[in-house]
Amino acid sequence: MEPVFDTFLLVEAYVRSDVSYTIDGRLNPSFFDTEELEEMTSNTYTTWGAVRHHIFNVIKGNKLPLNFKIVLILSDANINRIIEQNHLNLTTSDIANLSLNIYFDGEKISLTTMASMNIFSMDKTLANIWDANVSAFFKQNQIF
């Protein structure tokens, strides 16, 4: 598996094959020392890169999984970068998350994006920018 998504944060991963596997991406802060916590991108969720090999080991094999779902979100630093680059009148605290949902139903993969806000807004600018960023990311990494 390529490290393309390694900087994304993992909210959850679910794989259903011979048995069902669920990985909660929430970090257990008591497991880490202070220095390790300070070095992390997020103190809430692990990065995809930190668990990618575990999930790959669950998915690989002679048979495809029956289905799987992976929910990734951007770090606050990357959300802030999008805000600044697009001159949005928002702060990172206004945005709950920018997510990328990957779902395999046994035959095809569906990718959906979502911009979740902590404030009420009818403005869909952020959602449209997030969609465009994901499309550009896929193109840059030759995914589609």
What feature does the model see in each segment?
Residues 10, 15, 28, 77-79, ...:
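Generic "edge-of-domain/loop-turn" microfeature
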Residues 39-107:
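Surface-exposed, low-hydrophobicity interaction/linker segments
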